[in-house]
Amino acid sequence: MSTIEERVKKIVAEQLGVKSEEVVNTASFVEDLGADSLDTVELVMALEEEFETEIPDEEAEKITTVQAAIDYVNSHQA
């Protein structure tokens, strides 16, 4: 089983069409990885599906980096 960090990074790379080497913890989805607002919505939906959780809009707005996504999933896993 992959770690949460590995799973998040894989989803980010797939959703944003970037190389996995570019998906570092400090990377901003918009500034570093070239995501637009639609990309970020789709990314949140993919994270919700992968981790079987619901991310409220107000929380989703705060998930702007790879590390923020990892931290959110870690803190909301049962």
From Swiss-Prot:
Cross-referenced SMART domains: PKS_PP
Pathway: Lipid metabolism; fatty acid biosynthesis
Gene Ontology CC: cytosol; membrane
Post-translational modification: 4'-phosphopantetheine is transferred from CoA to a specific serine of apo-ACP by AcpS. This modification is essential for activity because fatty acids are bound in thioester linkage to the sulfhydryl of the prosthetic group.
Carrier domain span: 2-77
Keywords on record: Cytoplasm, Fatty acid biosynthesis, Fatty acid metabolism, Lipid biosynthesis, Lipid metabolism, Phosphopantetheine, Phosphoprotein
InterPro entries: ACP, ACP-like_sf, PKS_PP-bd, PP-bd_ACP, Ppantetheine_attach_site
Annotated positions of the O-(pantetheine 4'-phosphoryl)serine modification: 37
MF GO annotations: acyl binding; acyl carrier activity; phosphopantetheine binding
Any one GO BP annotation for this protein: lipid A biosynthetic process
Matches recorded under Pfam families: PP-binding (PF00550)
Family: Belongs to the acyl carrier protein (ACP) family.
Role according to the record: Carrier of the growing fatty acid chain in fatty acid biosynthesis.
NCBIfam families to which the protein is assigned, alphabetical: acyl_carrier, PRK00982.1-2, PRK00982.1-3, PRK00982.1-4, PRK00982.1-5
Protein name as annotated: Acyl carrier protein
